[in-house]
Design a protein with these regions (language model features):
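Basic polyanion-binding and macromolecular-assembly surfaces
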Residues: 1-46, 50-366
Length: 366
């Protein structure tokens, strides 16, 4: 794409947290993420990408070419269908039909053929079999031959196929859909995405030009657990049980202080495939610098971007391995400091700008 960036970039991002939980782990009761072998704190790349998306959505407010694909409460399949409609590509029609509990349980045990989903509402005692608009009927029939389900299941699926008016996009149409999604959604153009949903028109896969590592704390962290009290209860039953005391106990997890380091990479060749241009790049830098200013919450405490050092290569493929550039940025504790770090001033960030190789320019953006 002609307006795409023409240079490779690598960057170092430093951010910190004070008395907050920068990225809770849902598999560990929302405790701050930690490397169990070293005790260093972790923040996932997905967490940072979420904040970039939120910032872009806030600043651009859904402007043309700057909508966000993965946003809160989004139904992703709708975006695919909308893209195909805007391209004037005819789609099939999704089919939904009621079925029985026996069919539901049978397919749950056997597995569901590609292009078909089955859902249940146990409260309403209803079971819905859905054939996707782009389901491949031939592929489903092959599945029936290979898996040989019982007659009741086979009959239900065959009847659904008769009723369904499916149409699978051609390879050329899939590529058109992919291009439309890249053009319309900033986060797809930036980070890429898997756009081959089972329940929506296939838009292929996109490798994003911008990629991030996990962020790792400079020093080990010790998460703290705090008891908190709410001076109210949710139900009358709780109030009666507490004889009117009406208190609810809870837990809150924080990191007293941690400075995190993240590395990032921006590929010019991949930017050419998605149309990631200079305006997109500038928005990305702005997001990294300001994302925490619009993401405050009681759980996250005080977070801030402390440093963003950008290395720009004078070629698309780059002139120096990224790790050699990252080694120019070092972080050390200030001298004569034997107490745990509790502020950014407890660290000294050094950047050896004199050793930046030829063919690379460095910029300290914050």
């Amino acid at each position: 794409m002609t307006n795409a960036i023409q240079n490779r970039y690598d960057f170092v991002l430093l951010f910190d947290v004070k008395d907050g939980n920068p990225n809770g782990d849902p598999d560990a009761g929302n405790l701050p993420r930690i490397d169990p072998e070293t005790g260093h704190g972790l923040v996932t790349d997905v967490c940072i990408k979420r904040k970039v998306r939120n910032y872009a959505q806030l600043v651009k407010n859904g402007a043309e070419r700057y909508d966000i694909y993965v946003k809160e409460k989004a139904v992703l399949g709708r975006a695919h269908e909308e893209a195909f409609r805007e391209l004037g590509i005819q789609l099939g029609e999704e089919y939904k039909g009621h079925t029985t509990k026996d069919v539901y349980e049978g397919l749950e045990e056997l597995g569901v053929p590609p292009g078909i989903t089955i859902d249940c509402d146990e409260d309403a005692n209803t079971y819905i079999l859905t054939v996707a608009a782009d389901a491949d009927k031939k592929e489903i029939k092959e599945w029936l031959k290979e898996n040989k389900p019982v007659k009741g299941i086979k009959d239900v699926i065959n009847e659904a196929l008769k009723q369904a008016k499916t149409r699978k996009p051609s390879a050329e149409e899939v590529e058109q859909g992919r291009g439309k999604m890249c053009d319309k959604y900033y986060d797809i153009r930036t980070f890429g995405g898997v756009l081959s949903l089972k329940s929506a028109p296939n838009c292929g896969q996109v490798r994003g030009p911008v990629q991030l590592t996990f962020s790792r704390s400079v020093d080990q962290v010790v998460p703290l657990e705090h008891s908190i009290t709410r001076m109210a209860v949710a139900t009358e039953a709780e109030a009666e049980k507490q004889s009117g005391d009406n208190r609810t106990m809870g837990r809150k997890f924080t990191v007293p202080y941690a400075l995190y380091r993240c590395h990032g990479f921006i590929s010019a060749p991949l930017a050419g495939q998605t149309g990631f241009g200079e305006d997109d790049l500038n928005l990305f830098w702005d997001a990294l610098c300001n994302m925490f200013e619009h993401d405050h919450s009681a759980a996250r405490g005080q977070m801030a971007t402390r440093k963003l050092i950008v290395f720009k290569h004078d070629s698309q493929l780059g002139n120096v391995p990224a790790h050699k550039l990252f080694e120019l940025v070092s972080i050390n504790r200030v001298q004569n400091s034997d107490k745990p770090a509790r502020d950014f001033s407890d660290y000294e960030v050094k950047f050896d700008s004199a050793k930046v190789p030829a063919g690379v320019t460095a910029e300290i953006r914050i």
